[in-house]
Amino acid sequence: MEIAAKMVKVRKMEMILLLILVIVVAATAANVTYDHRALVIDGKRKVLISGSIHYPRSTPEMWPELIQKSKDGGLDVIETYVFWSGHEPEKNKYNFEGRYDLVKFVKLAAKAGLYVHLRIGPYVCAEWNYGGFPVWLHFVPGIKFRTDNEPFKEEMQRFTTKIVDLMKQEKLYASQGGPIILSQIENEYGNIDSAYGAAAKSYIKWSASMALSLDTGVPWNMCQQTDAPDPMINTCNGFYCDQFTPNSNNKPKMWTENWSGWFLGFGDPSPYRPVEDLAFAVARFYQRGGTFQNYYMYHGGTNFDRTSGGPLISTSYDYDAPIDEYGLLRQPKWGHLRDLHKAIKLCEDALIATDPTITSLGSNLEAAVYKTESGSCAAFLANVDTKSDATVTFNGKSYNLPAWSVSILPDCKNVAFNTAKINSATESTAFARQSLKPDGGSSAELGSQWSYIKEPIGISKADAFLKPGLLEQINTTADKSDYLWYSLRTDIKGDETFLDEGSKAVLHIESLGQVVYAFINGKLAGSGHGKQKISLDIPINLVTGTNTIDLLSVTVGLANYGAFFDLVGAGITGPVTLKSAKGGSSIDLASQQWTYQVGLKGEDTGLATVDSSEWVSKSPLPTKQPLIWYKTTFDAPSGSEPVAIDFTGTGKGIAWVNGQSIGRYWPTSIAGNGGCTESCDYRGSYRANKCLKNCGKPSQTLYHVPRSWLKPSGNILVLFEEMGGDPTQISFATKQTGSNLCLTVSQSHPPPVDTWTSDSKISNRNRTRPVLSLKCPISTQVIFSIKFASFGTPKGTCGSFTQGHCNSSRSLSLVQKACIGLRSCNVEVSTRVFGEPCRGVVKSLAVEASCS
């Protein structure tokens, strides 16, 4: 009886503990739903501002700071894709470690107090190799991607379930007390679904049903999918989404990808998006009824290893995002958007309460007003003209609206923010070069520290095989390597016309891309590259008898977008012919017996990660020769700034630091000369090629090396140089920030948005004038000089300011007095401070300062 009584007590205690656990979980769990205005969390509509950070494009050591900077910038949500190819590189062999530790990334966002939007896809596009699909998926029998195909649906459901179950196990959905408030299935399918016919409709319905069956307890969305079945929320992607409307009056207006810039391709100039236009797009979206928008990207990061897609997407995925590739703030973009977010949040009570009332204020001018029953009022005044500024009357008061701008009035009276008027300083950044040599010697002395191994030209591995005809590359390599050798031995008779004295043969090659090198009898004869198709005519010297033709085909990222992108293909598909340079008949080589080798000998022997006795250290170091592996050791650059390698002097290849692949390098890929301008007018619709820089220059010379991959000393750099270059020209560079600050603020600027309180009232009536604020970005810095200061009509931009026809003689001395020796300073932009240098014009204060 005594034992039985104890057992009853134990069971009662277990029940009590279980009840307590249920209560605790219930107390922390959130109920996430939606209505026509917004996502609803625990019964309250939310205005949400989100930003994309892709966890594999940075390192776990970088994640906390990236997430904190996102929060400091005014974000509520971190949005990320889930990268199937990284998590399941081989079928049923999973990877959730290192840069692919998705659980850790989501938990860090939660720790910072941010929500998460998990875009499972599992097709992601993202300029990621093969759109995020693992290439083994291509070889599943009977499979057809992204359509009503049973093998594909089975694999898609299996992986999606794997991710959802993992999130559930870690209690990461909001319904479990976690940060995930929204999940996405599929991705931009509506852009290309017409190519799949009727099967696309049934596939989308199946995708929605499958996702809902996983019972996450939070809503699901489909982006760019106008026929997304209920209860899926269809969302918008693009540079502008103010005109977007969801496919049901019961769904909120949501923007899952607001492209903050654009991606860079090898051979292309660098695109950028002016922050005035980006802010305009955001303000217009909230003006027109939106309540959730996401920056794609907020931090772009780096395409480490062989993850870049395209083809020909660069290793840098900087994207001109508010936080740059290296994790530093891009100013004034980050700061201007932070101020925008504060202004929008001042309007939240009114925004979520009702739909806007939109009225015309004139041609290309409009007002949107949100009012609550309790009397809260917020207004957005827009001028969508691309050239002309305007003065409008609203509620009996005049407001100046620059062209292509929106003013936000959290109380329907006072302007808290205008998208075209920046109150955040431009902060200069620069790379400081450091030699690889431990004692700081010149890079010219580095040859003695380098060792090398020559990669054999042509067939060198035991697993090479013979096949008649030309094989498509992806089907042959399964993307295990960028490299595929096509080798042919052909006999040339002595009476061939191209053996005549002074005559050459022409080797004609056609390839699907992306790079081809042609070796004749062991010597490089020519090469070419192209995104989709390569056609080469290479003059070559042949000999009577047996000649060896070795063609090395190289991929630079697999296609990631478009209908049937998985079938695009790569490699040498022919025709391949020999003919005389003088004309005449040609010899067909394509149909002959070719020997194939997948990958390089150096890859098989692990030269990037495993020490080898084959490394040669003797001088002279062979340079400007193709197909050479190089290795050196180096000390980590001093300081804590982000690190890059400048590959200027090399050709093309792949590099590793301490066994970690930093990606493909290609500093000899030069952008064309057309399309770049000294400045870019933010006014008017943005497009990917509107604002370009670095024309006529290498697309990318600097390649990110995360600090966490480095040791203080004894670091190993290995590179495979395929094209031919001089590795002794390589240098390290650390990215410095904050030495120069520049800002121009006019009398027509609104006061700093920080002067507003959360109840939409100006907190300090003495601070209702515009203010120029400067702050050194590093806590140990102070402003030590004012290079330029002018209150009046200054001209120019940062680094080239000049005085205009009107200037207060007190400008420099007053700014120096207010700022020198301080980390931050505020200077009121008014005649009360500077006097009246000229009447009848709106005056500005322009300042360029230096931080110590």
Curated annotation (Swiss-Prot):
Swiss-Prot/TrEMBL GO biological process terms: carbohydrate metabolic process
Pfam families on file: BetaGal_gal-bd, GHD, Glyco_hydro_35, SUEL_Lectin
Tissue note: Expressed in roots, flowers and siliques.
Keywords per UniProt: Apoplast, Glycoprotein, Glycosidase, Hydrolase, Secreted, Signal
Chief location bin: secreted
Record localization: Secreted, Extracellular space, Apoplast
GO cellular component, one term: apoplast
Residues at the active site: E188 (proton donor), E257 (nucleophile)
EC number: 3.2.1.23
Gene3D superfamilies named among the record's database cross-references: 2.60.120.740, Galactose-binding domain-like (2.60.120.260), Glycosidases (3.20.20.80)
Residues that carry a glycan: N31, N258, N475, N766, N807
Annotated disulfide bonds: none
InterPro entries to which the protein is assigned, alphabetical: BetaGal_gal-bd (IPR048913), Galactose-bd-like_sf (IPR008979), GHD (IPR041392), Gly_Hdrlase_35_cat (IPR031330), Glyco_hydro_35_CS (IPR019801), Glycoside_Hdrlase_35 (IPR001944), Glycoside_hydrolase_SF (IPR017853), Lectin_gal-bd_dom (IPR000922)
Domain SUEL-type lectin, chain residue ranges per copy: 766-852
GO MF annotations in UniProt: beta-galactosidase activity; carbohydrate binding
Position of the signal peptide: 1-29
Catalysed reactions listed for this entry: Hydrolysis of terminal non-reducing beta-D-galactose residues in beta-D-galactosides
SUPFAM superfamilies documented for this protein: (Trans)glycosidases, Galactose-binding domain-like
Family: Belongs to the glycosyl hydrolase 35 family.
Protein name per UniProt: Beta-galactosidase 8
